[in-house]
């Protein structure tokens, strides 16, 4: 079964010739500019495959203008507003060593490197100065750990294991709550 990755949302029709404005949900602009198959729909179940003919960034805005085969006029484009765009997972660019796809990290078990104790699992990632892994601890609370090699030296996706260096306060949700107060 084909796996799909979300790459954007159709937010508006653009002009009279069937183009749409897309809010990107990807760091790879070529996913919205390079021709090829894209799944477009309100959900994966009702999505329809369209061929992206062309796409371009709108200077100064976090938007792209895309043209799909078979969408030739504004009324057809307006029917796509609110839809999500997906690309086949097999079309993901090759990453350098030490780089990972967020969907591949989700749900991976996290362990303290010093004791080997399982402490929780990755539930999300957020961006600040650098990426922060959001780890749902076994007790239900969450902590954020900078996703840098010094603190997260082991990421073994095949084994489903991430190891974290437990410096004082890093894995203590109460310390994080005290900092927020």
Swiss-Prot record:
GO terms for biological process: maturation of SSU-rRNA. The keyword Cytoplasm applies. InterPro entries: PRC_barrel-like_sf, PRC_RimM, RimM, RimM_N, RimM_N_sf, Transl_B-barrel_sf. Residues 97-170 form the PRC barrel domain. One of its GO terms (molecular function) is ribosome binding. Gene3D superfamilies: PRC-barrel domain, RimM. It comes from the Bacteria. It is found in: Cytoplasm. The keyword Transport does not apply. One of its GO terms (cellular component) is ribosome. It holds the Pfam family RimM. Keywords: Chaperone, Cytoplasm, Ribosome biogenesis, rRNA processing. SUPFAM superfamilies: PRC-barrel domain, Translation proteins. The PRC barrel domain binds ribosomal protein uS19. Belongs to the RimM family. Binds ribosomal protein uS19. An accessory protein needed during the final step in the assembly of 30S ribosomal subunit, possibly for assembly of the head region. Essential for efficient processing of 16S rRNA. May be needed both before and after RbfA during the maturation of 16S rRNA. It has affinity for free ribosomal 30S subunits but not for 70S ribosomes. This is Ribosome maturation factor RimM. It comes from Gloeobacter violaceus (strain ATCC 29082 / PCC 7421).
């Amino acid at each position: 079964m084909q796996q799909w990755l979300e790459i954007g949302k159709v937010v508006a029709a653009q002009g009279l010739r069937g183009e749409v404005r897309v809010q990107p949900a990807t760091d790879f602009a070529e996913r919205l500019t390079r021709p090829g198959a894209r799944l477009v729909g309100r959900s994966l179940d009702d999505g329809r495959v369209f061929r992206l003919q062309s796409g371009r960034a709108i200077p100064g805005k976090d938007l792209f203008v895309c043209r799909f085969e078979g969408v030739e006029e504004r009324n057809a484009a307006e029917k796509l507003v609110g839809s999500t765009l997906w690309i086949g997972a097999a079309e993901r660019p090759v990453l350098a060593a030490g780089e990972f796809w967020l969907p591949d990290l989700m749900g991976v078990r996290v362990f303290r490197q010093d004791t080997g104790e399982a402490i929780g699992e990755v539930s999300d990632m957020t961006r600040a100065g650098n990426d922060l892994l959001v780890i749902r601890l076994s007790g239900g609370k969450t902590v954020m750990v900078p996703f840098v090699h010094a603190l997260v030296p082991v990421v073994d996706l095949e084994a489903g294991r991430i190891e974290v260096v437990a410096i004082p306060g890093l894995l203590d949700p109460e310390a994080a709550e005290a900092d927020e107060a």
